[in-house]
């Protein structure tokens, strides 16, 4: 598993794009025509677009870069690319998937229908195609509903991008269902409280990981997210392989790109316990569901069981995913 640090990439222009917004809106500018209509313009990797009143953070550009890179590689190897951008905001990801990854089709969805005009204006830089074979479509429904309807109609996607707030793991099952075998699932969590171990019951409910405060909470946040997806997929008889993970301090934001395939995990070695001693700083991983038996004598004999935080937790909690 790669863990990448945040870094801003330089802009790469796309001169072939129709650009209805002159260059005076260089990187981020606001133009208020009246109190009710607000236009905000941004530029990312050479693409100009509007954000309007939608939720947009330019700090997330690297996360979008990585999604686009994975999508472009997928298109190269499979010669097809259908994408569902489930929580698209102003539609910048959808636009970048269409332009940079040359997606054949993007379904851009955001529950907030106030974003519709902005999304449509942004995507209209790419010709929409015919009614029978559109390049892009915009919808405004709960992402779970869109994905479930696609699944029921057997309209599967090569890449599903879930750019959600907090630790909303309710998207996992519908997203996995609507994904083609060997497809890519790009997930997000912004729940720093859970990864920091401050809401163990919440992380347990969301991802099946009882997380306590650890000095490497950023890594734990990524593993927590991967672990939740692994568990959901395994219920459906599917296997998840992490391709990359990315932590960014703004938010904080945890992103993981997963490949989902047929076939169960070969054994339970992907489930582990992580122990950490707050006194000596020693950290240890116990692999497999037999960990409890392995850990018991260790914890009984060491100061962990009486003074360390994790000696007892090891016996009482489900595992957090440790090995990918
Ligand atoms: C983090 S923002 C998306 C940002 C966008 N992907 C980008 O890269 O700029 C999350 C978006 O999800 C939308 N949203 C929240 N709950 C949703 C749901 N259940 N289904 C679909 N969209 C939802 C919000 O309106 C918001 O625009």
What are the functions of these language-model segments?
Residues 2-324:
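SAM-dependent transferase fold signal centered on methyltransferase-like domains
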